[in-house]
């Protein structure tokens, strides 16, 4: 500590000197890449959440969250975030898998191309009909033997939560 000599008469006054903590907002891409740079600022001050969008193969970026599993507070680019009083806060990238719907012509040809979308999202079944010599196309089904759910072109199909959904041509 420093030494302070009191004056011979009167009162000596000491003044406290304070410095505001510099704190950090970090971004964790959770398997992605291209995350924003960390942001620093004064403790308890507001910063704008970065609009830089990370990428991850086979996933769609859905935003940032204060908890890795997405159970915290959601943030998007441009939102205001209040920095902590000390240390570092982290925002975690949130991802939705991109899944596919494929069409199996079961011996036919000219089937529609695969469709992709976010997990559990709706897509419209293609109106493109495959052909097969000597057969009439009856529609699509989720089971090869026709025992699943029937779909016709233009119907709404909900993509699976992961992997690939397949519709089989029925003849």
Label each PLM-derived region with a short phrase.
Residues 1-171:
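Secondary-structure capping and domain/repeat boundary segments
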């Amino acid at each position: 500590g420093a030494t302070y000599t009191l004056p011979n008469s009167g009162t000596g006054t000491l003044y406290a000197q304070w410095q505001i903590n510099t704190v950090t907002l970090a971004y964790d891409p959770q398997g992605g890449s291209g995350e924003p740079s960390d942001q620093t600022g004064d403790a308890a001050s507001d910063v704008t959440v970065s609009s830089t969008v990370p990428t991850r193969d086979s996933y769609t970026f859905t935003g940032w969250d204060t908890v890795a599993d997405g159970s915290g507070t959601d943030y998007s680019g441009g939102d205001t975030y209040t920095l902590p009083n000390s240390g570092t806060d982290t925002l975690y990238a949130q991802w939705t898998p991109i899944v596919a719907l494929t069409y199996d012509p079961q011996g036919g040809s000219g089937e529609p191309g695969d469709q992709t979308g976010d997990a559990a999202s709706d897509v419209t079944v293609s109106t493109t009909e495959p052909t097969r010599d000597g057969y009439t196309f009856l529609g699509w089904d989720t089971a090869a033997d026709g025992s699943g759910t029937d779909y016709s072109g233009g119907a709404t199909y909900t993509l699976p939560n992961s992997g690939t959904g397949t519709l089989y041509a029925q003849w």
